[in-house]
Amino acid sequence: NLLDTADSYGDDGHNESLVGTALAGRRHEFVLATKTGWVKRAGPYGKEVVGVDGRPGRIRSACEASLARLKTDVIDLYYLHRVDLDVPAEESVGAMSELVAAGQVRSLGLWEVSEATLRRAHAVHPISALQSEYSLWTREPEETVMPACRELGIAFVPFSPLGRGFLTGAVKGREGIAPGDWRANNPRFSEENLARNAALLKPLEDIAQAHGSKPAQVALAWVLSRGDQVIPIPGMKRRGHLDENVAAVGIELTPEDMAEFDAAFPPGVAAGERYTPEVARWAGR
């Protein structure tokens, strides 16, 4: 019953508005999470991310706007979507803690920060959740922030647990990327890197076949197996995808499956960086 959105999803908080409308009369049934931090400006293809703003005043005004769009008086989990390179994380989290004190927010989260930043922020106000990319082809958090989350009692919330769609097996070449798809500019989805990464799918497909499941379901089952504090949030646009993801909960991977995954998907196995240099400078700060 966790719903995850952000003020930067769609133009002018459009996704938050959709969520707010959908939850009318049912708000109490869901844990509602949203985020702030990204700054967007008009571009040739709609509004585009141009920076990060973690100033206290901006965080307060962003929260007020999110509450209005979500049609609620409290946000269950409020994330700092990125750390502003010009504002100490402690200052941003301090402003967010004031929102908790005011009753507008129940708990705080961070998004793709380093272990050091996580610990500094947690010292200012308890951090309830850390959201970061994590999947079979992005296992680097196992060596950094995941141990810290276990130590501090922080939930680890993987986004893109299906490798931005790659682990579904639907994108094995550039022909699988439609015009306007943002992945067209992602390094891991370049023609050269896709050709190299496609070889990773064979062991995943073999294990999925053995379970009578789809590759995406087995990839999600692997993330779900990583610990009770790991709460993946796969993106879903279609009801069929939702049903498939729910079914992944019932897949029990064997020790042999896990060993095969470790051999086929060690940390750093994917060809290509996760982000372009322009976006990467805000990740893991």
Where are these regions (language model features)?
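N-terminal binding-site loop/beta-alpha segment at the start of enzyme catalytic domains
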Residues: 1-34
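Glycine-centered flexible beta-alpha turn that most often forms the glycine-rich phosphate-binding loop
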Residues: 3, 75, 108
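Active-site mouth loops of central-metabolism enzymes
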Residues: 45-60, 86
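Active-site groove signature of glycoside hydrolases
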Residues: 67-85
